[in-house]
C-alpha cells in the first residue's frame, strides 16, 4: 500500500483527497505548510508527494527546490488552472507531473498510479540486461542510476526513464508519441508541453559533448534522437 504525502493549506481539500485515495487503496498524511511539508518529504516515509504551489511559510517551488537537492521522491504538483508558468516552472525544477486545480479525483489517482509505475520500473519494454553503457553514460536499471564519465547524475524518475528510452534507441529517432506513452504513461496531447520540459531538464543535466554538440537533438514535429559518436 503506497503512502502519499499531501502538502496543501486547503484542509478541506486535503480531507476530501485523503478520503478518495483511501478508497483507492492508498494511505495518506496531510500537512498544511511548506516548512513542515519539506521536513516530512525528506523523511523517506512516503512513496510520493502531492505538492501545492501556494503554501504558507515556504511556497511549493521552494519546497521542491530544497527537496531535489537530496531526494528523488516523486512529486505531483497542483497548479492554478490555466497558469502555464506555474506548470512550466514546476517541471523545470523537478516535478514528475502536474495537475491543475480544480481537478477530477479520478484523474489524480490515474496520474499518481502512472508516476508510481514509472518509479517502480514496471515497464514491459525495459531491456533484459540490468545495466548498459552508451558512450560515456553508464546506466543501472536495477539501481535506477545513471553516471556520466563516472559521476552519478541527479535525475528525477521521469528524467531517468526518458534517458533510458532514448539511450535504448541511440542514433535513431524516438517519436514524441511513443516517449509520452512510455515515460509519462499517457497519450501525447497537442497542448501538453510536459515531455518537452523534461527533455530540456535532461539536456541541462547531461550538458554538451566535448565538441560542443548536443547529446539529445530535436527532430521537429517528430521526436528526439540521442546522438552517438
Where are these predicted regions, by residue range?
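Short, Lys/Arg-enriched segments at the junction into DNA-binding effector domains
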Residues: 3, 114-173, 177
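Charged docking surfaces used in two-component/phosphorelay signaling
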Residues: 12-23
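Active-site beta3 strand of CheY-like receiver
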Residues: 45-50, 55
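DNA-binding patch around the recognition helix
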Residues: 124, 129-131, 154, 197-199, ...
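Short hydrophobic/Thr-rich beta-strand motif most characteristic of the beta2 strand and flanking loop
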Residues: 25-33, 40
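His-Asp phosphorelay/catalytic-motif detector in bacterial-type signaling
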Residues: 45-47, 70-75, 189
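Basic, amphipathic DNA-recognition helix from helix-turn-helix-like DNA-binding domains
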Residues: 59, 65, 69-70, 74-132
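Conserved sequence signature across two-component system core domains
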Residues: 7-8, 31, 49, 99
Amino acid at each position: 500500500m503506497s503512502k502519499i504525502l499531501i502538502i496543501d493549506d486547503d484542509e478541506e481539500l486535503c480531507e476530501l483527497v485523503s478520503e478518495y485515495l483511501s478508497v483507492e487503496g492508498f494511505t495518506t498524511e496531510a500537512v498544511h505548510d511548506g516548512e513542515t511539508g519539506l521536513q516530512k518529504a525528506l523523511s523517506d516515509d512516503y512513496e510520493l508527494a502531492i505538492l501545492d504551489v501556494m503554501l504558507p511559510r515556504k511556497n511549493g517551488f521552494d519546497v521542491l527546490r530544497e527537496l531535489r537537492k537530496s531526494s528523488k521522491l516523486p512529486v505531483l504538483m497542483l497548479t492554478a488552472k490555466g497558469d502555464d508558468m506555474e506548470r512550466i516552472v514546476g517541471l523545470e525544477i523537478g516535478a514528475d507531473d502536474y495537475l491543475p486545480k480544480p481537478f477530477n479525483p479520478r484523474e489524480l489517482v490515474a496520474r499518481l498510479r502512472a508516476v508510481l509505475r514509472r518509479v517502480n520500473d514496471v515497464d514491459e519494454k525495459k531491456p533484459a540486461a540490468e545495466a548498459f553503457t552508451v558512450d560515456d553514460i553508464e546506466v543501472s536499471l536495477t539501481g535506477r542510476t545513471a553516471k556520466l564519465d563516472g559521476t552519478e547524475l541527479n535525475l528525477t524518475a521521469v528524467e531517468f526513464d526518458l534517458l533510458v528510452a532514448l539511450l535504448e534507441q541511440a542514433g535513431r529517432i524516438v517519436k514524441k508519441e511513443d516517449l509520452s506513452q512510455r515515460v509519462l504513461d499517457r497519450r501525447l496531447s497537442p497542448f501538453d508541453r510536459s515531455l518537452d520540459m523534461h527533455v530540456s531538464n535532461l539536456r541541462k543535466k547531461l550538458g554538451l559533448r566535448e565538441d560542443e554538440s548536443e547529446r539529445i537533438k530535436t527532430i521537429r514535429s517528430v521526436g528526439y534522437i540521442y546522438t552517438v559518436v
